[in-house]
């Protein structure tokens, strides 16, 4: 009857807040009344309020107290089901496994609701454009840090949608040459890399972290590193001059080798391999903006870079980054074989072969 009365009233954001506040009151009633049915059925007003709030938020321009109250009430319900479920089990004395499942479902529901409300509100306030490069990045960082400190893993997981939208915006800029500068297009990449490095420190500050929470943040870190690799390759293609694309790819590949020593992870090896392959494409494909390397020296450059990768991997004790060494050396082998078969081998080809023999002798000793 409360839900029917409120839904039929003149609807506004404040009416939605009253609906959700009704559910908050029913949740609090478990402590003095200990009636489990009030808590469960009392979520109906909040569900109505959340559904109806989407339409109102989509037409809301700017910031104000009414959207803030609505968001805070939804956030409060998400935290209640996440943090107070043990009290809910103790007071109601139901089946423990069943109560955990109920708390789990409502925590996911309200976590998704708060993220979707913020998303609709931001899109209504800021139309989807190049501005979302920084809006999505900043929002994701703020919510991820908050979820790590409050251990609200579902809120942190769902908040990645903001960064995903920023990444989609960057992809459109890089592929279709839409509006946007090189610095703005770098914001989502820097956000992902920075967040992947900061997450371990945030979890340490928050104290003991559950295994599921640690696994969730581990997946986020791994996804960030791999996604940032692909976005960096697009950024190089779009904003770096053609005669520098190869060298930038090589430098980033070496940076992945160093990062693998500083913070060991298998994905650094894959990132190094990806930049190596893109560098080879820029080196061998040429195009309208060829790199300033004579064609006869390309084979020698491939072998030389591969050897540098080999010794760098040994110095940092990172076996995963040996894939970049094999990539450049194999490319050098193929180029040498082609030059010999076509009888086009010159002095640089001989220098590359002698360089390989020299490294082989050094390695034996």
Predicted regions and their residues:
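Alpha-helical transmembrane segments of multi-pass membrane proteins
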Residues: 1-365
């Amino acid at each position: 009857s409360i839900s029917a009365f409120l839904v039929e009233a003149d609807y506004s954001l404040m009416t939605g807040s009253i609906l959700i506040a009704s559910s908050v009151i029913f949740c609090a009633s478990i402590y003095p009344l200990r009636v489990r049915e009030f808590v469960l059925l009392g979520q109906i007003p909040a569900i109505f309020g959340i559904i109806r709030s989407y339409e109102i938020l989509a037409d809301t321009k700017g910031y104000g107290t009414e959207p803030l109250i609505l968001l805070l009430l939804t956030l409060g319900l998400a935290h209640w089901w996440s943090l107070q479920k043990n009290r809910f089990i103790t007071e109601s004395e139901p089946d423990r496994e069943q109560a955990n499942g109920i708390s789990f479902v409502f925590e996911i529901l309200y976590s998704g609701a708060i993220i979707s409300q913020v998303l609709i509100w931001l899109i209504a306030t800021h139309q989807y454009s190049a501005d979302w490069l920084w809006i999505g990045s900043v929002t994701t960082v703020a919510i991820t840090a908050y979820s790590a400190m409050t251990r609200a893993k579902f809120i942190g997981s769902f908040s990645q949608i903001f960064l995903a939208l920023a990444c989609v915006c960057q992809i459109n800029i890089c592929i279709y040459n839409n509006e946007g500068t090189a610095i703005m297009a770098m914001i989502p990449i820097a956000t992902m890399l920075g967040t992947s490095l900061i997450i371990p420190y945030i979890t340490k500050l928050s104290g003991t972290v559950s295994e599921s929470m640690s696994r969730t943040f581990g997946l986020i870190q791994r996804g960030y590193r791999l996604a940032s690799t692909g976005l960096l390759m697009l950024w190089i293609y779009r904003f770096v001059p053609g005669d520098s694309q190869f060298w930038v790819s090589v430098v980033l590949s070496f940076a992945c080798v160093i990062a693998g020593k500083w913070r060991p992870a298998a994905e650094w090896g894959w990132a190094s391999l990806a930049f190596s392959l893109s560098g080879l494409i820029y080196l061998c494909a040429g195009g309208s903006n060829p790199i300033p390397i004579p064609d006869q020296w390309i084979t020698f450059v491939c072998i030389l870079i591969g050897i540098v990768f080999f010794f760098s991997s040994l110095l940092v004790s990172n076996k995963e980054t040996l894939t970049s060494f094999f990539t450049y050396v194999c490319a050098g082998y193929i180029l040498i074989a082609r030059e010999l078969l076509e009888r086009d081998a010159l002095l640089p080809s001989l220098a590359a072969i002698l360089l390989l023999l020299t490294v082989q002798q050094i390695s034996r000793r």
